[in-house]
Structure formats: structure tokens, C-alpha cells
Swiss-Prot record:
NCBIfam families: PRK09248.1. HAMAP family: YcdX_phosphat. Zn(2+) 1 binds at residues 7, 9, 73, 192. SMART domains: POLIIIAc. SUPFAM superfamilies: PHP domain-like. This is Probable phosphatase ECA2529. Its EC number is 3.1.3.-. Homotrimer. Coiled coil: none annotated. Belongs to the PHP family. One of its GO terms (molecular function) is zinc ion binding. It comes from Pectobacterium atrosepticum (strain SCRI 1043 / ATCC BAA-672). Zn(2+) 2 binds at residues 15, 40, 194. Binds 3 Zn(2+) ions per subunit.
Length: 245
């Protein structure tokens, strides 16, 4: 099991069912040392209000040995790569995941999806691209992997894509893992948990990683320190409270 989960949702996204406290308890039981709460960006219909993200500064950084990252799953809005995490919000989050969601960016064609995803990476705010294997948003996988390596953005293997949502993702996810491996890029693992019991469940992601012989040192989730070093390399300030995780 990997000790870090970088994608999950709380009741602040109203189609999810657990609180921050629920996740802390589950993390302690599963020996998860660091997780990121990444509720949906405000352009989604049931997303938290802008104030939710602006007030995340009240969250503790460390609770009973479990580190907490303040995150967002932002929406890619257009072919120019705009996302719905801008201005003062950028100063309140530690980790920015960005991805396509149908209510914000209706599926179009492969070239448009590829251009929008690469533009998002090039803009420099997103650290991770969420569920890039979604078959409703086909992309040029090789081009995406090469751009991610160029811009130091991690592509996500999303465990939920194999079991609950985005059915038909598995062939794309395998191809993405292979392409990222060959491009020298990074992968991020996300449970995409919408209820605390799913925290840290990477069962299907781990199977893909083994099948393609993906290098462990290029998976962010191998340790809290690996994640924190990556975020600092990307220009985020060091988080003193998490230094000893």
C-alpha cells in the first residue's frame, strides 16, 4: 500500500459522503501518512463555494500523525487551458489537480482535448492532471505524456476509473502509464474517494503499474517526502509542519 492519497472528495462536494474528520480516522487505520482533500472547483454545479477554498487556512496541517494537504480538483474550462482556480485561491491551496468534467467542458474531439490539456499544463498552475484516461475525452496519449514530462506535471492513475466511474478507462490508463514511463514523467495515484472507506485504495492502479513495470521512483505516492519535494520543486512554499512526515 502507498502511504499517500492525492485525490478525494468530502461532503463539501455534495455528491460525496465523508468529512475531513472521517478521512483522518480512516487514514490512521490504514497507515496513510498524508492525503490531499481535492474537492471540485467552483464551476461544477455541486462544488463548494469559493469561500470554502479561501478558508482552508483554518485546517490543521497535522492531526495525530496524519498530514493534510489543502487541494482542489479544478476544472479545465476551455482550449486555452484556463481552470477555475485563479487569483487569491492559488495562494490557499497546496496541490492543484485539473481535469475534464462534462458539465464544465462538454466532450469534443481528440485534437481539442489534447490541446486543452497541454495548454493547462503549460500555464503552470496545475500539478496533476486527473483521470486523463477518461474515454469520453480521448487525447493523444503520447503527446500528453511528453508534455507532462516537459512541464513537470504528474498524470494520474485514478482507481475509481476502473470500478465506479468513467467505464472503459482501463486500456487508456495502461497506455498512459506506458507513455509516461517512456517519456520519463511522473504518475500520481488517486483513489478519487467519495466516501472515506475508499481512502488509499489503489488496487487497480497497482495492477497496471506492475503490468507495465513502472519505476517506483517516479510515482509521487511512494512517500510524503516525495510529494512535498515535488510541490516545492513546482514553486510551492515548504510546509514546516509536515517536514518530519
Amino acid at each position: 500500500m502507498y502511504p499517500v492519497d492525492l485525490h478525494m472528495h468530502t461532503v463539501a462536494s455534495t455528491h460525496a459522503y465523508s468529512t475531513l474528520h472521517d478521512y483522518i480516522v480512516e487514514a490512521q487505520q490504514k497507515n496513510i501518512r498524508l492525503f490531499a482533500i481535492t474537492d471540485h472547483g467552483p464551476d461544477m454545479a455541486d462544488a463548494p463555494h469559493y469561500w470554502h477554498f479561501m478558508n482552508m487556512r483554518v485546517w490543521p496541517r497535522l492531526v495525530d500523525g496524519v498530514g493534510i494537504l489543502r487541494g482542489i480538483e479544478a476544472n479545465i474550462k476551455n482550449i486555452e487551458g484556463d481552470i477555475d482556480c485563479t487569483g487569491p485561491m492559488l495562494d490557499q491551496v497546496d496541490v492543484i489537480i485539473a481535469g475534464f468534467h462534462e458539465p464544465v467542458f462538454p466532450p469534443q474531439d481528440k485534437d481539442t482535448h489534447t490541446a486543452a490539456m497541454i495548454a493547462t499544463m503549460a500555464r503552470g498552475d496545475a500539478h496533476i492532471i486527473s483521470h486523463p484516461g477518461n474515454p469520453k475525452f480521448p487525447v493523444d496519449i503520447r503527446a500528453i505524456a511528453e508534455a507532462a514530462a516537459k512541464y513537470n506535471v504528474a498524470l494520474e492513475l485514478n482507481n475509481s476509473s476502473f470500478i465506479h466511474s468513467r467505464q472503459g478507462s482501463e486500456p487508456n490508463c495502461r497506455a498512459i502509464a506506458e507513455a509516461v514511463r517512456d517519456a520519463g514523467g511522473l504518475l500520481s495515484l488517486g483513489s478519487d474517494s467519495h466516501i472515506a472507506f475508499s481512502l488509499g485504495d489503489f488496487t487497480h492502479c497497482e495492477r497496471i503499474l506492475q503490468e507495465v513495470n513502472f519505476p517506483q521512483d517516479r510515482i509521487l505516492n511512494v512517500s510524503p517526502r516525495r510529494v512535498l519535494d515535488f510541490l516545492e520543486q513546482r514553486g510551492m512554499p515548504a510546509i514546516a509542519e509536515l517536514a518530519d512526515l
